[in-house]
């Protein structure tokens, strides 16, 4: 189903013109609309509701594909392991300190924005 221009504008504005996942700035024309819960996760209706649509850059939309968020989070977390196991240039970069790996929780941009909004509202008296 095609998403209307009015809906696309609302999706674009959800996170102030940023990708909901990595947080990069998006030009409206470059935004891709991602289904937060994959379309096959809905029973016929609901997949194109605003609450299920996320502004996404091409890279994030490509790699998230039709995966649920937690599966994609695991995929991202495992990137260094995949690079170490099969990429000679990456191994050399690690060996010479050109690449430094950091283990930290994967927090998507929309999660950070929503957490900060909640903290700001909680701090108001």
Q: Model features per residue range: what roles?
A:
Residues 10-17:
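Sequence/structural segment immediately N-terminal to covalent heme-attachment motifs in c-type
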Residues 1-10, 24-28, 51-54, 62-125:
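Extended charged
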Residues 37-53:
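Short linker/helix segments within small regulatory modules
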Residues 22-25, 39:
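Short hydrophobic alpha-helical module
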Residues 6-9, 40-44, 59:
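A general structural-boundary detector
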Residues 29-33:
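Canonical RING-type zinc finger of E3 ubiquitin-protein ligases
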Residues 19-22, 57:
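Short cysteine-rich clusters marking metal-coordination/redox-active sites
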Residues 35, 61:
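Histidine-centered active-site/metal-ligand motif
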